[in-house]
Amino acid sequence: MILLIDIGNSRTKYVQLISGELSATTQLNNSEFSAEYFTKYFNQASQLIVANVAKSALTDELATWCAREKISYKQVHSEQKKNTLISAYQEPTTLGIDRWLALLGTIHLYPQENVLIIDAGTATTVDLLTSNGQHQGGWILAGINALFTSILSHSTLVHAKSKTMPSLAFGANTSDNVNNACWAATLGMIERAIEQAQQLGDINRIILTGGDGKALTRLLLAQTTENILAVENIQFIDNLIFFGLQEYA
């Protein structure tokens, strides 16, 4: 059994890879990371494959434990090329590992398709992948929560509470004004990305992932999609990153 591990800024997710199939996802706070946890939950693994966007101390601790337990350990990094995927970055290692693995995961699921990938988490990223595996680059925007807190932190006169229900309606109070504008701005960026991508060639599929990806998928599907893409080709894929990590197994 191989463990695929995604270490985020505050939380870690992992899945088991058994005979080519991914298990359900387990999540934990990074504060729970310890040798005791590893021994309890990871000691049956033959290999750990890790992606990390957090402090290196977490992976250092995990690598040390693996060495002691004689378990194979591999931390993956963004590259210029992997399989058929070619990075658009002039300095490939500076592409976020989460974006790199989302691109790899997309090729794993949908080879030889032109795909627009939107990952909506701490940041909302857009990446265009063409059918020959060429990454065409993308955009990075502050995530929904970051947009919200940025407005409040730069104005002492705006008082609003974050709401979990996304809406594009014009608000009749400050909280709705701020919340709905954050969703509208993000959706507007996505729609502009779709238009720009289509100018470069036909798009076969739009994939959304990340913590806010499901809500954005619903908002996107609620808009007029006739000129965007067939509804069945606009989809949310939870934990797309693990399909990318699987390529390193």
Swiss-Prot record:
Cofactor names: NH4(+); K(+)
Protein name as catalogued: Type III pantothenate kinase
Subcellular location: Cytoplasm
Residues that bind substrate: 89, 96-99, 174
HAMAP family noted in UniProt: Pantothen_kinase_3 (MF_01274)
NCBIfam families: baf (TIGR00671), PRK13322.1-5 (NF009860)
Top enzyme class: transferase
Keywords attached to this entry: ATP-binding, Coenzyme A biosynthesis, Cytoplasm, Kinase, Metal-binding, Nucleotide-binding, Potassium, Transferase
Biological pathway: Cofactor biosynthesis; coenzyme A biosynthesis; CoA from (R)-pantothenate: step 1/5
Catalytic activity: (R)-pantothenate + ATP = (R)-4'-phosphopantothenate + ADP + H(+)
Chain positions recorded as ATP binding sites: 6-13, 122
Active site: 98 (proton acceptor)
EC number(s) reported in the record: 2.7.1.33
Gene Ontology molecular function terms on file: ATP binding; metal ion binding; pantothenate kinase activity
One GO-annotated biological process of the protein: coenzyme A biosynthetic process
Cofactor: binding details: A monovalent cation. Ammonium or potassium.
Disulfide cross-links: none
Taxonomic classification: Bacteria, Pseudomonadati, Pseudomonadota, Gammaproteobacteria, Alteromonadales
Stated family: Belongs to the type III pantothenate kinase family.
A GO CC term assigned to this protein in UniProt: cytoplasm
Subunit structure: Homodimer.
Function: Catalyzes the phosphorylation of pantothenate (Pan), the first step in CoA biosynthesis.
Binding site for K(+): 119
